[in-house]
Amino acid sequence: MRCPNCNSLDTQVKDSRPTEDSSVIRRRRVCVACNFRFTTFERVQLRELTVIKRNGRRVPFDRDKLMRSVQISLRKRQVEPERVEKMVSTIVRELETGGEAEISSEVIGETVMEHLRTLDDVAYVRFASVYRNFREAKDFADVLGELSGEEEARLAAIRK
């Protein structure tokens, strides 16, 4: 591992431990050349995914881009970062174990929406508005109607 301070390749791992959900390994490192201490994170990657964009282009899957888009939809919402990280890890794991090395951006978007729907309704609507390219207020009303209908069905099931 290259030292971010002096660019030396001579570093040592001082401490290694998994995160709470064991999806990431946190390593505390020290540079032998300058004694700079830094932390790295390692994540298991089951397979290389390629995203097929709507215009047909193929690009490598970027977990960080997925995380950024989810975080944008959750901006100013009271959702713990650990829950967001766990949700994104779950989504990535589902995509990696789905059997296909190439996956359409539509499948990724629908998977994210499915998970956001259970995490935070407002984030779900925000993400849907960008992903589904809402053009008018009716588009928002339709999604809100879906959410209201699901809530009414859930309450009716509880009452029975």
UniProtKB/Swiss-Prot annotation:
Keyword Metal-binding part of the UniProt annotation: yes
GO molecular function: ATP binding; double-stranded DNA binding; zinc ion binding
Record-linked Pfam families: ATP-cone (PF03477), Zn_ribbon_NrdR (PF22811)
PANTHER family the record matches: TRANSCRIPTIONAL REPRESSOR NRDR
Role, per record: Negatively regulates transcription of bacterial ribonucleotide reductase nrd genes and operons by binding to NrdR-boxes.
unnamed Zn finger ranges: 3-34
Keywords of this entry: ATP-binding, DNA-binding, Metal-binding, Nucleotide-binding, Repressor, Transcription, Transcription regulation, Zinc, Zinc-finger
Cofactor binding, per record: Binds 1 zinc ion.
Gene assigned in the entry: nrdR
Similarity section: Belongs to the NrdR family.
GO BP terms in the entry: negative regulation of DNA-templated transcription
Protein source organism: Bradyrhizobium diazoefficiens (strain JCM 10833 / BCRC 13528 / IAM 13628 / NBRC 14792 / USDA 110)
Domain ATP-cone, first and last residues per copy: 49-139
Full protein name: Transcriptional repressor NrdR
Cofactor(s) for this UniProt protein: Zn(2+)
Chain intervals with Polar residues compositional bias: 1-11
Region (Disordered): 1-20
InterPro entries: ATP-cone_dom, NrdR-like_N, RNR_NrdR-like
HAMAP family, per database record: NrdR (MF_00440)
